[in-house]
Amino acid sequence: PVQLTENSGVAFIGCYVLGMGFVLDVEEAQEWIAADARNAEVLFPYLNGEDLNSRPNNSPSRWVIDFGMREHDEAVTYPLPYERVLTTVKPERAKLKIAYRRDNWWRFAAWAPSLRAATSDLSEVLVLAQVSNTAQPVFIPNGTVPSHKLIVFASDSRALLACLASSVHYVWARKYSGAMKNDLSYSPSDVFLTLPRPTTTRRMEEIGTVLDEERREIMLRRNLGLTKLYNLVHDARLAYDKDVERLRAIHVEIDDATVEAYGWGDIHLDHGFHSYRQTERWTVGAAARIEIVD
């Protein structure tokens, strides 16, 4: 499919750090900030796909040293972070053939300046794990550094959340993206840039808000990450779980609202348990999937 101009500048791959020496545990980051408040200028929560999908509040379990695009002379003025990167990252980067990464060893290999510019005015952004069986987007606070294993959407729109959480988006992604084992390997250029998005409607805004609020409450109350929660949603043996039934109902409403926004009133979605890509999922039926991508 053709890449669409209206979708450009929205979906980005996160930052490619390249060097475990940049990464700190939460306690050490807080100790460094307590030792010198200026360190807060270069220390940030660091979120990867595993944390996003496994932690009930989708929060980062680690922090990262991020000098941004600062020159070396300025990076030196943050002694603790600089010393860590000097001793742990520089020796590894010295072995690299790519000159920029070797010579600018105190910087991320890919800092994602376009992503940062696109999200600079937002208090939160939508993210999706790049490799995932769940393939569900969630909002996170802006200011968290996303790893290159996250896809970031420069938007705080609840209607876009609904669109990305819909079966239409999932079926499109499965058709046009790669796979890693049975998991979806999401490529923004192949999936989001080519996806003809529906008209934004009030119904999509409203059901996107419902999904965001109710799913978050269920995850926190039951101490479940996205992967474990959606494993329950896709488990045909689970028939009498009110939270799971509610989440399935929300996704039916999301799909109905999305199809309506596209103007596809004649598609019978046939929600239920269907075999898809060698696994059983709670999703739309085979005939609906064919109509969606045709």
Language-model-detected regions and their locations in the chain:
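S-adenosyl-L-methionine
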Residues: 1-294
